[in-house]
């Protein structure tokens, strides 16, 4: 792996060259070559600027613990093995991931995605904050250790599953004060939890299946649950079955359907 001690400074990456600038006035910087298929390890926080489309091959980007990083892409894309973010670190991601690949995010730290990606993401651990409408095409959570936090209305997809899929042991979706509608929630088991951590702003979780459907996961926090079918006739087959935990003090609203 290549280890780069940013120490709060700036680094630019173009082709195989990476240049460390000790301060804003340092326009020349210290340059070294980067080998494809090797990880880059950034330490001690700082700013990274992509100046070309980058393909790391089987290499990824590793960020150490307890620091903040700002990644900017100027419209260029990154492609590689994924992103590993250390505990209590936050990576403000203002770059693009390649649309012909899947971004893998691991590590307990936070990926704060500030630009619509046009790609898919798989989350094994840590937080991913969504700040744009339809931030990712599809989101996959597994193992129960990952969390997706909505920071904008409509930041998930617009298909029947809202573009988020909870596989074995799932993970957490934090509505964070934003309403969200599903036709069905793609949750494999009770490892999935949908919550609202915003204690001052109620979030509406609407599940509007028109055929019988079982949600195996959990619902908690400051959530109002609704199951409404837009039909003058009651849909007797539009049964929503909840066999996980539901723990909310807010209303549960059902119209033209069964719960």
Question: How would you label these PLM feature ranges?
Answer:
Residues 1-259:
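Beta-strand-rich extracellular passenger or scaffold domains
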């Amino acid at each position: 792996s290549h280890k780069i001690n940013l120490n709060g400074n700036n680094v630019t990456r173009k082709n195989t060259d990476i240049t460390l600038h000790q301060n804003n006035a340092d326009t020349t910087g210290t340059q070294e070559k980067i080998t494809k298929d090797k990880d880059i390890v950034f330490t001690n926080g700082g700013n990274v600027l992509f100046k070309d489309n980058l393909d790391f091959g089987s290499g990824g980007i590793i960020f150490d613990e307890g620091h903040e990083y700002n990644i900017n892409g100027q419209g260029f894309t990154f492609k590689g093995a994924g992103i590993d973010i250390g505990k209590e670190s936050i990576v403000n991601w203002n770059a693009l991931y390649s649309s012909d690949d899947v971004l893998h995010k691991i590590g307990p730290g936070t990926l704060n995605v500030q630009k619509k990606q046009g790609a898919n993401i798989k989350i094994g651990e840590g937080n991913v904050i969504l700040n744009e409408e339809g931030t990712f095409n599809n989101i996959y959570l597994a193992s129960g250790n990952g969390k997706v936090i909505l920071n904008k209305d409509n930041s998930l997809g617009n298909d029947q599953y809202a573009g988020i899929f909870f596989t074995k042991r799932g993970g957490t979706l934090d509505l964070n004060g934003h309403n969200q509608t599903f036709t069905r929630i793609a949750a494999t088991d009770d490892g999935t939890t949908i919550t609202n951590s915003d204690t001052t702003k109620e979030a509406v979780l609407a599940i509007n299946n028109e055929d019988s459907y079982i949600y195996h996961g959990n619902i908690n926090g400051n959530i109002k649950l609704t199951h409404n079918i837009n039909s003058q006739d009651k849909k007797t087959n539009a049964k929503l079955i909840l066999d996980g935990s539901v723990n909310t003090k807010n209303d549960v609203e059902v119209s033209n359907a069964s719960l």
